[in-house]
Amino acid sequence: LMALDRTGRVQPVIAQEGAICDFDVAHGEAVFTALWDTIPMELYRARLDDAKDARRITRLNDDLMAGRYIAKPVGHRFSFEGWDIDGWVLLPEDFDEKKRYPALLNIHGGPNAVFSTAYSHEMQVWAAQGYVAFYCNPVGSEGRGDAFMNIHGDFGGADYRCIMRFTDYILEQYPQIDR
């Protein structure tokens, strides 16, 4: 969540990795719902003058999450046709570099959609079941401007090539993935 003052200066209000889904601002505070990397949707409050002051108001998922393995997304960046592409990996519990693991590639719909570090229940389930779960924002995804998103005339081409390059990159980074 960013704030823009009257001079055009932009500053972070909340700088934590994840996704802020809804918010309201009043009386120098923001109230918002967010998914962080390892915490499902909850309600938070933060003072606008202190980006590090976010306080969790609800604990709706604490009982559900208690005692469960929650993987922290590991960020990766690779190059594809002149673009820096962001992707993430969730590793299984007690990941052992000497063992082999099955893997699952998750591809978002759209193509005009986007992944982030935000908590993802389906990828957490896969990691908890012993899979290396990996996903990226290929060309055609949102959040990087029109030129990145525009794959008109190459739908199923550029995005496919990008996802396959990401898969090759992850297989290089994680030789523990069983082929």
Task: List PLM regions with ranges.
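Structural recognition of the beta-propeller blade-terminating site
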Residues: 4-5, 47
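Anion-binding and metal-coordination hotspots
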Residues: 17
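Terminal RNA-binding accessory module
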Residues: 1
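Serine-hydrolase catalytic core recognition
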Residues: 21-179
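A short beta-strand motif characteristic of beta-propeller blades
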Residues: 9-14
